């Protein structure tokens, strides 16, 4: 597919610090956070004017699912927009709590684990053709996804019985299966539940569960862009070496804990390769494919360059060439400098706080955003792009139809029902409009409905 629909679903960690008032459970804080949403949407599960979905997931985790995007920069802008939307909700919840005598502080974190050992996810969605064997696609992708943490991990200080260690990935120690139709119970690498949110005759949705939430825009580009390139290669029928792993769940943990990239992975055929070997195999295949077929979008040269530089940096042990572009390397540089200046070890509570605050979505408090403001974290999209994406849907996908409908219905105070594929006014006997083509941003049926609303 030269054009593909992408989406990212992000679950956020929530916390409340209250030195002078009674503590609040995360569930209570989440209710304050969503009170404004419930007041206008009559639900904690709503679609917004930018085409995205905002809701409370299992327990107390706010979740933001981007609108359908067909460009990687567009995807990153809309993912970033979710942070701004939720940060605004934090400010309003903070004011409401203060009015009720609660003087603590609400925090939202774009990370994947909390201090109690709970994990919450960042899920990627890729539209793929229905034709072809899904099991074969999963077999080819899983070795890549197990080792992708080298280039796209968010980094984490991991507490072990032998002391603290720095790991590539936050999510790796919480994955329990290769493929599964469940997302919370078994936490697979790839979710196989067949919900395309599109015409099921032609499309399927690849739902990747294993990734970390990225603060870095270039890390997010690398995470999604590499999968897109490998999918194109598979769709073109390129033959890949058999790199199925004997035990991908054990391997994903061992790889995460070894920053040299040389952790050995035993393959199902008995061979042993390092994580770096496996990543280089995919990189070389993709590079050859692009050399033969050309780059299908303007982001491909940067994706290939950063992929190469990241693997080279891991192999050499010198991450200075990537420490403004790859989350784990940005975070490690930050921590190494802080430990050196303050004579601390990795198991210091101050380092644990630094690890957490890196993921604070507050533009005023969050350490990542302080680094970004100083030019120490590379940008791909402008702040104007992000602010535009808070209100406006992507103009080139089905999200435009949904966003325009939601906006008009809200402006006119009309009662409506909407999801990824359906649009309906509840206060008249209109037939539900079914939008099964996610690439279609113009639809005369939707135009007629909007015109009829006045």
Swiss-Prot record:
Keywords: ATP-binding, Ligase, Magnesium, Metal-binding, Nucleotide-binding, Ubl conjugation pathway. Pathway: Protein degradation; proteasomal Pup-dependent pathway; Protein modification; protein pupylation. One of its GO terms (biological process) is proteasomal protein catabolic process. It catalyses: ATP + [prokaryotic ubiquitin-like protein]-L-glutamate + [protein]-L-lysine = ADP + phosphate + N(6)-([prokaryotic ubiquitin-like protein]-gamma-L-glutamyl)-[protein]-L-lysine. The active site is at 57 (proton acceptor). It comes from the Bacteria. ATP binds at residues 53, 66, 420. It holds the Pfam family Pup_ligase. It is an enzyme of class 6 (ligase). Belongs to the Pup ligase/Pup deamidase family. Pup-conjugating enzyme subfamily. The reaction mechanism probably proceeds via the activation of Pup by phosphorylation of its C-terminal glutamate, which is then subject to nucleophilic attack by the substrate lysine, resulting in an isopeptide bond and the release of phosphate as a good leaving group. Catalyzes the covalent attachment of the prokaryotic ubiquitin-like protein modifier Pup to the proteasomal substrate proteins, thereby targeting them for proteasomal degradation. This tagging system is termed pupylation. The ligation reaction involves the side-chain carboxylate of the C-terminal glutamate of Pup and the side-chain amino group of a substrate lysine. This is Pup--protein ligase. It comes from Paenarthrobacter aurescens (strain TC1). The lineage of its organism: Bacteria, Bacillati, Actinomycetota, Actinomycetes, Micrococcales.
């Amino acid at each position: 597919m030269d054009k593909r629909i992408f989406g990212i679903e992000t679950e956020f960690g929530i916390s409340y610090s209250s030195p002078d008032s009674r503590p609040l459970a995360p569930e209570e804080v989440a209710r304050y956070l969503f009170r404004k949403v419930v007041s206008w949407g009559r639900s904690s599960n709503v679609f917004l004017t930018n085409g995205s979905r905002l809701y409370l997931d299992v327990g107390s985790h706010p979740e933001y699912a981007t609108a359908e995007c067909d460009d990687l920069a567009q995807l990153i802008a809309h993912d970033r927009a979710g942070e701004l939307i939720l940060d605004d909700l934090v400010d309003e919840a903070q004011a409401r709590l203060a009015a009720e005598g609660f003087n603590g502080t609400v925090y939202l974190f774009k990370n994947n684990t909390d201090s109690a050992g709970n994990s919450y996810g960042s899920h990627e969605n890729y539209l793929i053709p229905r034709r072809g064997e899904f099991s074969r696609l999963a077999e080819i992708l899983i070795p890549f996804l197990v080792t992708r943490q080298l280039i796209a991990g968010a980094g984490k200080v991991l507490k072990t019985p032998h002391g603290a260690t720095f790991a590539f990935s936050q999510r790796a120690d919480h994955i329990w299966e290769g493929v599964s139709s469940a997302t919370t119970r078994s936490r697979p690498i790839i979710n196989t539940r067949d919900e395309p949110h599109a015409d099921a005759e032609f499309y399927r949705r690849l739902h990747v569960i294993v990734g970390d939430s990225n603060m870095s825009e270039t890390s997010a580009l690398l995470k999604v862009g590499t999968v897109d390139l490998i999918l194109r290669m598979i769709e073109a029928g390129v033959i890949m070496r058999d790199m199925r792993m004997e035990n991908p769940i054990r391997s994903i943990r061992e790889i995460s804990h070894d920053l040299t990239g040389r952790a050995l992975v035993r393959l199902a055929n008995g061979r042993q390769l390092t994580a770096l070997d496996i990543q280089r195999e995919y990189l070389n295949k993709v590079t050859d494919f692009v050399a033969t077929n050309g780059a299908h979008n303007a982001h491909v040269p940067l994706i290939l360059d950063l992929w190469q530089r990241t693997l080279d940096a891991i192999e050499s042990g010198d991450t200075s060439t990537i420490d403004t572009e790859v989350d784990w390397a940005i975070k490690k540089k930050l921590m190494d400098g802080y430990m050196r200046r303050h004579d601390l070890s990795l198991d210091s509570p101050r380092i644990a706080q630094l690890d957490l605050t890196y993921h604070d979505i507050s533009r005023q408090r969050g350490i990542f955003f302080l680094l970004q403001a100083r030019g120490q974290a590379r940008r791909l999209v402008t702040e104007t792009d992000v602010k535009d994406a808070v209100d406006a849907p992507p103009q080139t996908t089905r999200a435009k139809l949904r966003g325009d409908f939601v906006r008009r219905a809200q402006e006119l105070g009309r009662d409506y029902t909407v999801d990824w594929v359906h649009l309906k006014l509840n206060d008249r006997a209109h037939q539900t409009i079914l939008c099964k083509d996610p690439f279609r941003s113009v639809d005369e049926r939707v135009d007629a409905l909007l015109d009829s609303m006045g």
